[in-house]
Amino acid sequence: MNCTLTDNTRAINVASNLGAPQQRTIFAKERISIPGYYEIIQFLGKGAYGTVCSVKFKGRSPAARIAVKKISNIFNKEILLKRAIRELKFMNFFKGHKNIVNLIDLEIVTSSPYDGLYCYQELIDYDLAKVIHSSVQLSEFHIKYFLYQILCGLKYIHSADVIHRDLKPGNILCTLNGCLKICDFGLARGIHAGFFKCHSTVQPHITNYVATRWYRAPELLLSNQPYSKSVDIWAVGCILAEFYARKPVFMGRDSMHQIFEIIKVLGTPDKDILIKFGTIKAWNLGKNSNNPVYKKIPWSNIFPFASHEAINLIESLLHWDSTHRLNVEQAISHPFLNEVRKPDDEPVCLQGPFDFTYESELNSMSKLRDYLVEEVKNFKTDLSSSSL
């Protein structure tokens, strides 16, 4: 249902359980227009893909705060459309898991200068990067508790044959009570083999923009081979090490520098691993006599205050060879987490593998636009049904 509002801002499918608002709340400076039953608390920031502010329902006590992310100019940029569609589909698919951020509402506003896709999500006070890099003292129990939650969320994601592809502390939100929630599914990808076979397609190579460099697995830096869930496991290993270092452990300025930052700690990879990567870049890494040969530095030397179990888990996650890394089920069962683990509260996604075959049909801007509008309509229809 399209609603013409008093400020001539048109919105698609305003939540029916709240009623169609007769006016809009305007934040002119940031070109934000939201339904009149919200009031804006504050502007939170602006990034590459949108503007974020916090809002609350008018006249409600206690006032639950909501984060609103506006993605501007979305219908004119293919990359924004693709990211938005992916994120909406994945967040809807994974809704309900306590360690994955919850999408509350969606709205498409078409009236300039407020036009864009508006995503309403639960507002969470911090991201994990702020926690790790703060002066707050973290005990090993805290680290176990945080890591366990990350792995619970990742287990749910991986059980649907989905790779997040951009796990990092900045994409893990943290409530005041210490509850972690994985967010930002704009780069996530379904990898179930059956769907590739159905459409006679092959698994694509990972794109250059996927995975923030500091958390990027070696195979993403050196190989053109299809990637697997192990790229997320590498990122988890980087995050675990970062808990102890209180800063990222591999901080490369570019892709090649990133490789050498990893080499300085893990040592120069064996030739069979370099051959397995299957690229000239990887082969030259071992062939070039100007490159110094590094020996592996024991993680226990880097983090002498960490427990034996923590060191063992870091070593088991950060392997040059992706096939030697633990999978998420093995990681969550590691003795390091015995103190905090609740095996009966580690659900998997019962909807089965995520079907990503829709992507092959979205081969034009017009199809992408129409698909996004349809996704928003479907979300709001489901939202209205669930509120009855």
UniProtKB/Swiss-Prot annotation:
Binding site for ATP: L44, G45, K46, G47, A48, Y49, G50, T51, V52, K69
Record carries keyword Ligase: no
Subunit comment: Interacts with GSC2.
PANTHER family given in the database record: MITOGEN-ACTIVATED PROTEIN KINASE
UniProt free text on domains: The TXY motif contains the threonine and tyrosine residues whose phosphorylation activates the MAP kinases.
EC number: 2.7.11.24
Cofactor: Mg(2+)
Gene that this polypeptide is encoded by: SMK1
EC top class, as a word: transferase
Reaction it catalyzes: L-seryl-[protein] + ATP = O-phospho-L-seryl-[protein] + ADP + H(+); L-threonyl-[protein] + ATP = O-phospho-L-threonyl-[protein] + ADP + H(+)
GO CC terms: cytoplasm; mitochondrion; nucleus; prospore membrane leading edge
Record PTM: Dually phosphorylated on Thr-207 and Tyr-209, which activates the enzyme.
Keywords carried by this UniProt record: ATP-binding, Cell shape, Cell wall biogenesis/degradation, Kinase, Nucleotide-binding, Phosphoprotein, Serine/threonine-protein kinase, Sporulation, Transferase
A GO term, aspect molecular function: ATP binding
Active site, UniProt feature: D166
Free-text function comment from the UniProt entry: Required for spore wall assembly. Required for proper deposition of the two outer layers of the spore wall, the chitosan and dityrosine layers. Negatively regulates GSC2, an alternate catalytic subunit of the 1,3-beta-glucan synthase (GS). Participates in a developmentally regulated signal transduction pathway that coordinates cytodifferentiation events with the transcriptional program.
Any Pfam family: Pkinase
Regulation of activity: Activated by tyrosine and threonine phosphorylation.
Name of this chain's protein: Sporulation-specific mitogen-activated protein kinase SMK1
Occurrences of domain Protein kinase (ranges): 38-337
A biological process from GO: regulation of cell shape
InterPro entries named in the record: Kinase-like_dom_sf (IPR011009), MAP_kinase (IPR050117), Prot_kinase_dom (IPR000719), Protein_kinase_ATP_BS (IPR017441), Ser/Thr_kinase_AS (IPR008271)
Span of the annotated motif TXY: 207-209
Organism: Saccharomyces cerevisiae (strain ATCC 204508 / S288c) (Baker's yeast)
Family to which this protein belongs: Belongs to the protein kinase superfamily. CMGC Ser/Thr protein kinase family. MAP kinase subfamily.
